[in-house]
A protein has these predicted regions:
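N-terminal lobe of the biotin/lipoate ligase/transferase fold
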Residues: 1-141, 145-157, 167, 211-212
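Solvent-exposed residues in well-ordered beta-strands and their adjoining turns
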Residues: 108-110, 166, 179-181, 206
Length: 235
């Protein structure tokens, strides 16, 4: 059973978190490459990380994203104090704001599964199971990534968790953002994930709650991650 170290960076600027992710990601890849030149009994075990954090208001555009899905100007971004980054993950545009639970699994998939689609579907299952604990029925939308509420109803389908990753040499980075207590105001200024005519939602909105316990929900995510990835978490 692989071990995954849990890290919690709290509220952190996106650029700083991205750099810290890259450091862990590169460390794992470099170790894998070094192992190639060593006999099996001398190879080093590659690390795995599950990073939790939140970000100040930030828009990120993935490798398949279109700039026109950002509906405001650079000047408006500056006036609102919102950061914008073109990033090296898959997917289109999304929004990070305080009140989300952002999770970055930095994993060597050789410990888990060498199948990107299966990895993504398993990440979605972690969130689907977590939401079930809070009485929220969630699932997938055909031909779309992430976790959705009422995906079977075209007029009511709404995204509650966005996902986008990078993977090289079977090492992953980036991850997902689960909407919990956050405002949805900033989502009005983008075409979320590049999908038109679909809205976003939060756990609070679905449960008609003023606020929800972030740390408690993190524990649920950890539990389901450990079960679904057959991993031992270390904190």
């Amino acid at each position: 059973m692989p071990t995954v170290q849990v890290l919690d960076w709290g509220l952190i600027d996106y650029a700083q978190a991205w750099q810290q992710q890259e450091t862990l990601y590169r460390k794992t890849i470099d170790l894998k490459l070094a192992n190639r030149d060593l006999p099996p009994n001398e190879q080093h075990l590659t690390p795995n990380y599950l990073v939790f954090c939140e970000h100040p208001p930030t828009y990120t555009l993935g490798t398949s994203g279109k700039y026109e899905h950002l509906l405001i100007t650079p000047k408006q971004l500056e006036e609102q104090g919102v950061a914008f980054y073109k990033v090296n993950r898959g997917g289109d545009i999304t929004c990070h704001v305080p009140g989300q639970i952002v999770v970055y699994p930095i994993l060597d998939l050789h410990h888990f599964m060498t199948d990107i689609s299966r990895f993504m579907r398993t990440c979605e299952e972690v969130i689907i199971h977590t939401l079930q604990e809070y009485g929220i029925a969630a699932s997938r939308l055909a031909d779309a990534t992430g976790v959705w509420i009422e995906p079977q109803n075209p007029k009511q389908a709404r995204k509650i968790c966005a996902m986008g990753i990078r993977c090289s040499r079977w090492v992953t980075m980036h991850g997902w953002a689960l909407n919990v207590n956050n405002s949805l105001h900033f989502f009005d200024q983008i075409v979320p994930c590049g999908i038109k005519n679909k809205t976003v939602t939060t756990m609070c909105q679905e449960l008609k709650a003023d606020t929800l316990p972030i740390n408690e929900i993190k524990q649920s995510i950890k539990k389901h991650f450990a079960l679904l990835f057959n991993a031992q978490l270390s904190e």
